[in-house]
């Protein structure tokens, strides 16, 4: 957890009356926790407006009959609510999703670019209604309701009165606040009702592109928290702390600001007092009736905001993500009118173009190589805090430092947690829908785009984890739109770099983007990343790319593919691939069959798929690591999936890590020894900021039958944040077609700090560059011959376990001793931690290592930590299997 310091601000004012009901745009409730606040997460009911004949004035009155309505929670979408209450069957199982009402939209283009199909129940608006008791303590207060996420447009009613019209209340990423004071009934029942319409094809909504099917309601609903707040006459909004580091990156100056809104009909005079480490500063404030004023504390005026020894926020891979907290108070005498809290970090992010034109980022004066993945929320945008915790813990466990958000700019919980965990976030608009169809924009579209940009900039500017904003995705906006976005960012005092798009396309306004999105997205062999010099290879900053499909582990496949469709691969499998060009796993499967030999069963296919995923992800991240800072960043497409998927993830929908997860984890070791597929060299990549002297690299080559053919050891020093070549791997005599390479890195004291294991072929993968047609993938001319792996003798490992799980503990640990007693390689050893009650992995689970290989006679201890709540009070079952490993349960050590 991060450390914190508290800054307090107090504003004194006179008590006055409140104005009539009005909507305030761009006032994020989540950024200002008021003195009195309730969240309306429960008590919601929804129904199609085609089924409700009553007008909004009646729907929003207490006692309105809602028999037959669907109960739900918020955040949610219409389809999400109908799935939750079992109106619809599990859409993630088999092909249930495509049988939902409204799924008859065309597959020729993205659903976001289509009108709702005829007969869809989601052509109608849907009512979202909540009847709740307003706290008695809210009496005499200024009461507001906050909607930071409505998809897409809404008529809003409260206690029988319309307070918002769909002509104004529209935009997935806009933030709305309504003053309810004159209509609210403190201590009694109140009703809020929204008549929500799904986004049309010209609306700036959200789309799932080709990741997975788009739900038939286009995620219509309330997708962020709804809160009701009570305050005095003056409201505090948009608190912001901006830091400026001195060139020594030790001292820092802070500027604290907030918008003060006088909701009364009388002038308010007061003073703002700020405290920092026992020091206080003060300035007078006067607000005319209805006035909003930005109050600022500048360090030149208030020396208390000049910190000589600032504690900096760092990405967790570099240092501690230290967080400060500022508390703002507005008081009338001894009575608090409103409060606000803002958590922030002191850090400075800059970017520049290298001599080759590639964008490189620095934080607090240190360059860093971006190694990240793209995150996806739940398909129905439901809040899943435990799953989010697991997602972010997995990010850190693998060694990734960045998460990208293409649209779906999530709830504040997401950014609060990335701040605390020191994980960088790269948000921006989405591609492939109205967001990039600028030629079709109307004045209203432009207004929504501008308001969305302003709201999100104000919301995210305090979060130290957010280090850049992409205001274009697959391409940059035209000059007039780009200038509009840049003006809005400037007005919001956006503290970080912004980039015109995720692609390499330049603009006339800002020039080169310095990034690229040149793929691939389909399967490519490990050699691709170092061999390619024109597309997705390891140079520049690749904002989205992937070695292709990622088949979930067998136990997970059984959870979403019906038993009669599990083998051979059929259309049910393909339905869980992607969209557009990614509707099958055929390219991946062809490579699997040609490199590893034809799969003979689901189990055979799955073990080979895990080996491919491990090798593919490791090769991609290792290539970008070896080439730093010719390569400046890479974003794996993707981290996770919004539903059970066969493509683009590092762990599956059920949170089970597979081969790709552990290939990534291996590649991202802080001090790492690795092999290069392009020139058969061995390098050491140092991702720390300390020089490492007196290291030794050992490389051993083994034949398929585990005979040692070559053993080489060299000394080397490794500079900080650098990659150094250690040696070349020659091909010795007697090499089998399929062979193995084991690498070890030891420090000055002889301690093993990194090891790596490769399965290679004397027949290399070769790419057919002439047949490359687009950025999706590059076809192969020849395939490596790894079929020898099928003839590896079965190995029964010696194994024992020690479990540390005290009664009542929420976190358990286990240590597993493994030994290969045979004369053969134990290849791709997989350990599982499962519940005895269910044949499912207990997740999230954090293995030191997995999908590893053991030399003949080699012994290793592997540790794991896990969440005990999945085990129903029992100890876990530890299981071992692998490519040529006899499956067994691991017994207790004696």
Regions found by a protein language model. Name each.
Residues 24-146, 204-222, 234, 252, ...:
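Extended carbohydrate-recognition surfaces in non-catalytic/accessory domains of CAZymes
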Residues 36-39, 45-54, 68, 73-78, ...:
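Substrate-binding clefts and catalytic carboxylate motifs of secreted carbohydrate-active enzymes
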Residues 48-51, 98, 117-236, 263-264, ...:
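Accessory beta-strand-rich segments of carbohydrate-active enzymes
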Residues 99-104, 108-118, 169-170, 180, ...:
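An acidic-aromatic loop/edge-strand motif
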Residues 156-158, 251-289, 293-298, 680-718, ...:
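Beta-strand-rich binding/interaction modules
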Residues 240, 329-395:
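N-terminal carbohydrate-binding accessory modules
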Residues 306-340, 731-784, 843, 865-894:
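Terminal connector regions
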Residues 402-580, 612, 616, 630-631, ...:
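Substrate-binding/catalytic cleft of secreted carbohydrate-active enzymes
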């Amino acid at each position: 957890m991060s450390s914190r310091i508290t800054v307090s601000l107090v504003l004194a004012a006179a008590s006055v009356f409140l104005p009539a009901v009005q909507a305030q745009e761009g006032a994020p409730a989540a950024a200002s926790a008021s003195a009195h606040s309730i969240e309306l997460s429960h008590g919601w009911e929804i129904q199609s407006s085609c089924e409700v004949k009553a007008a909004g004035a009646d729907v929003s009155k207490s006692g309105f009959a809602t028999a037959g309505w669907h109960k739900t929670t918020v955040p949610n979408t219409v389809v999400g609510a109908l799935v939750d209450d079992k109106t619809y069957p599990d859409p993630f199982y088999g092909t249930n999703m495509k049988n939902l009402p409204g799924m008859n939209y065309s597959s020729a283009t993205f659903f976001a670019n289509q009108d709702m199909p005829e007969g869809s129940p989601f052509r109608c608006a849907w009512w979202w209604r909540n009847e709740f008791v307003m706290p008695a303590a809210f009496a005499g207060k200024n009461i507001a309701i906050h909607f930071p996420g409505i998809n897409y447009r809404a008529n809003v009613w409260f206690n029988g009165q319309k307070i918002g019209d769909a002509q104004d209340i529209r935009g997935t990423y806009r933030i709305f606040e309504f003053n309810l004071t004159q209509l609210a009934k403190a201590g009694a029942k109140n009703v809020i009702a929204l008549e929500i319409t799904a986004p049309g094809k010209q609306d700036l909504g959200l789309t799932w592109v080709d990741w997975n099917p788009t739900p038939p309601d286009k995620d219509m609903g309330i997708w962020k928290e709804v809160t009701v707040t009570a305050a005095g006459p003056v409201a505090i909004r948009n608190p912001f702390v901006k830091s400026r580091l001195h060139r020594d990156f030790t001292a820092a100056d802070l500027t604290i600001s907030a918008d003060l809104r006088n909701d009364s009909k009388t002038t308010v005079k007061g003073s703002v007092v700020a405290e920092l480490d026992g020091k206080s500063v003060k300035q007078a404030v006067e607000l005319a009736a209805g006035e909003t004023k930005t109050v600022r504390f500048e360090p030149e005026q208030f020396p208390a905001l000049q910190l000589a020894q600032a504690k900096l926020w760092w990405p967790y891979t570099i240092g501690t993500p230290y967080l400060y907290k500022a508390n703002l108070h507005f008081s009338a005498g001894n009575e608090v009118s409103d409060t606000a809290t803002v958590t922030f970090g002191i850090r400075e992010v800059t970017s520049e173009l290298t001599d080759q034109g590639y964008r490189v980022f620095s934080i607090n004066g240190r360059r860093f190589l971006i190694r990240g993945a793209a995150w996806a929320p739940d398909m129905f945008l439901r809040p899943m805090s435990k799953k989010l915790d697991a997602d972010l813990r997995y990010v850190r466990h693998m060694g990734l430092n960045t998460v990208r958000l293409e649209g779906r700019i999530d709830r504040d919980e997401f950014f609060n947690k990335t701040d605390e965990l020191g994980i960088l976030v790269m948000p921006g608009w989405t591609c492939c829908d109205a967001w990039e169809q600028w030629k079709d924009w109307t004045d209203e579209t432009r207004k929504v785009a501008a308001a969305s940009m302003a709201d999100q900039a104000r919301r995210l500017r305090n979060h130290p984890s957010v280090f850049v904003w992409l205001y274009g995705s697959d391409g940059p906006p035209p000059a007039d739109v780009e200038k509009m976005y840049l003006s809005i960012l400037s007005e919001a005092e956006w503290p970080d770099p912004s980039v015109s798009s995720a692609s390499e396309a330049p603009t006339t306004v800002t020039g080169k983007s310095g990034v690229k999105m040149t793929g691939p997205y389909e399967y490519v062999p490990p050699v691709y990343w170092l061999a390619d010099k024109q597309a997705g290879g390891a140079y520049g900053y690749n904002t989205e790319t992937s070695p292709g499909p990622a088949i979930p582990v067998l136990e997970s496949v059984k959870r979403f593919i019906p038993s009669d469709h599990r083998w051979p691969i059929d259309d049910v499998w393909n339905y869980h691939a992607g969209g557009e060009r990614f509707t099958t796993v055929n390219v991946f499967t062809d490579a699997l069959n040609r490199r590893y030999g034809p799969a003979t069963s689901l189990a055979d296919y799955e073990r080979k798929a895990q080996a491919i995923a491990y090798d593919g992800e490791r090769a991609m991240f290792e290539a970008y690591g070896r080439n730093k800072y010719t390569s400046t960043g890479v974003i794996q497409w993707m981290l996770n999936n919004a539903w059970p998927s066969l493509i683009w993830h590092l762990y599956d929908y059920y949170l089970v890590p597979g081969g790709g997860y552990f290939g990534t984890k291996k590649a991202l070791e802080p001090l790492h020894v690795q092999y290069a597929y392009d020139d058969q060299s061995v390098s050491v990549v140092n991702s720390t900021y300390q020089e490492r002297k007196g290291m030794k690299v050992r490389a051993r080559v083994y034949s398929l039958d585990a005979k040692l053919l070559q053993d080489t050891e060299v000394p080397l020093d490794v500079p900080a944040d650098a990659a150094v070549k250690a040696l070349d791997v020659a091909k010795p005599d007697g090499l089998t077609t399929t062979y193995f390479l084991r690498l070890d890195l030891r420090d000055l004291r002889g301690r093993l700090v990194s090891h790596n294991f490769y399965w290679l072929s004397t027949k290399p993968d070769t790419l057919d560059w002439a047949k490359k047609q687009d950025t999706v993938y590059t076809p192969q001319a020849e395939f490596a011959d790894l079929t020898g792996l099928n003839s590896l003798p079965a190995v029964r490992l010696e194994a024992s376990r020690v479990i540390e799980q005290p009664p009542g503990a929420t976190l358990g640990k286990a240590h597993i001793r493994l030994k290969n007693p045979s004369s053969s390689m134990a290849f791709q050893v997989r350990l599982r931690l499962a519940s005895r009650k269910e044949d499912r992995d207990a997740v999230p689970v954090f293995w030191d290592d997995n999908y590893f290989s053991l030399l003949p006679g080699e012994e290793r201890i592997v540790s794991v930590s896990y969440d005990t709540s999945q085990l129903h009070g029992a100890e876990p079952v530890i299981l071992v299997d692998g490519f040529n490993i006899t499956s067994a349960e691991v017994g207790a050590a004696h």
